[in-house]
């Protein structure tokens, strides 16, 4: 995480009220619940530029960790698959559609949206990636 005073103050915020339910759904308890609150900050509008940047950093970390975890799982569970097939499996699990569906299955809070159809798959995927990034930042890759 960034070491600026603003980032530290953002991390000091209290977690969202539904954080405990989400932790139960994730099967992970945050040692630093403020990281989960930061990941879920996209649910609030407007965000300060500092909060948005810190949340995007968690999203970056979550995206990288997810891609690695999926690649490892596909590699181990598909021993006969060609490299092209492995890439397609990983792409399916890492797509916006796949991530948005997973976000719904694990019960991530749904951000408000001006669209009657709700938030886009991109928004849900990014929210999931930021939560995954918060988990990795909080507990390491084993989280």
What are these regions (language model features)?
Residues 2-143:
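RNase III-family endoribonuclease catalytic core
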């Amino acid at each position: 995480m960034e070491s600026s005073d603003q980032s530290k103050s953002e991390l000091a915020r209290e977690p969202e009220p539904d954080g405990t339910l989400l932790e139960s759904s994730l099967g992970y308890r945050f040692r630093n619940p403020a990281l989960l609150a930061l990941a879920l900050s996209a649910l609030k509008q407007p965000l300060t530029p500092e909060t948005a940047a810190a949340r995007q950093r968690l999203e970056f970390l979550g995206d990288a960790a997810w891609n690695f975890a999926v690649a490892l799982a596909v590699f181990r569970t598909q021993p006969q698959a060609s490299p092209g097939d492995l890439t397609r499996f990983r792409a399916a699990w890492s797509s916006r559609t796949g991530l948005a569906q997973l976000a719904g299955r694990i019960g991530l809070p749904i951000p408000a949206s001006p669209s009657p159809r709700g938030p886009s798959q991109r928004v849900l995927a990014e929210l999931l990636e930021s939560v995954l990034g918060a988990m990795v930042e909080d507990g390491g890759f084993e989280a």
